Amino acid sequence: METATIIVIFVSSLLLGITTYSVYTAFGPASKNLRDPFEEHED
C-alpha cells in the first residue's frame, strides 16, 4: 500500500475511535457519574 493510504486509514480510524469513545462516555453506563452544571444551578 502507499504511504498516503495508510495515513488516511490511520487518521480515519483514530477519529472514529475518539467519536465512539465520546458517545459511549456521554450516553453509556458511565454517564450517570457525570455532573450537570445546569441542574446544579437553580434560579
UniProtKB/Swiss-Prot annotation:
Any transmembrane segments, and where? 7-29
Q: Which UniProt keywords apply?
A: Chloroplast, Membrane, Plastid, Thylakoid, Transmembrane, Transmembrane helix
Q: Does the keyword Mitochondrion apply?
A: no
| Chief place where the protein resides | plastid
Say which domain of life the source belongs to.
Eukaryota
| Keyword set includes Phosphoprotein | no
InterPro entries per record:
PSII_PsbN
What membrane topology does the UniProt entry give?
Single-pass membrane protein
**Localization (cell):** Plastid, Chloroplast thylakoid membrane
GO terms of biological process kind = photosynthesis
Q: List the Pfam families hit by this protein, alphabetically.
A: PsbN
Gene Ontology CC annotations of this record: chloroplast thylakoid membrane
Record function comment? May play a role in photosystem I and II biogenesis.
Entry-linked PANTHER family: PROTEIN PSBN
Similarity remark: Belongs to the PsbN family.
Q: What is this protein called?
A: Protein PsbN
**From which organism does this entry originate?**
Phaeodactylum tricornutum (strain CCAP 1055/1)
In the UniProt record, what gene is named as encoding this protein? psbN
